[in-house]
Amino acid sequence: MKRACDFHVGDSFELVREADRYRPIYYAAVSGDFNPIHIDREVGRAAGFPDAILQGMCTMAWLADACTAYLEDPARVRRLRVRFSRPVVVGDVVTFRGRCVAVEGPVIRLEVEARNQRGEDVLKGASAEGWVEDLA
């Protein structure tokens, strides 16, 4: 597992996730968010979307997955900040691209962008803070 000295400003990482037909249903089952706009195509269309939309917290969980993969341990993720800018629609493919912007002792600061396959931002101002202690 990486130590704090192994993280460098400019490091980059990427994670790609697809919002398949079942993703909002699976997420509803574990979160309890059964709002029909997330699981019923016709409700999504009635709301002006081409299909059902993914729960925002599922998109945020994917952001956490991207940061966790880079930091190599979920316990290292200390803070996530995000603003939702566009719903993720069933069928969308979201690419999370992040980079390390600061290493200050044990604190690792990350900035992440998330875009769908049309190049549209689905998150704005996404950032994370990791804590990596070098225990001998």
Per-region residue spans from a language model:
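HotDog/MaoC-like acyl-thioester-processing domains
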Residues: M1-S12, V88-A136
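Residues in well-ordered beta-strands of folded domains
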Residues: A28, R83, E129-W131
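Mid-chain, well-packed structural core segment of small domains
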Residues: C67-F96
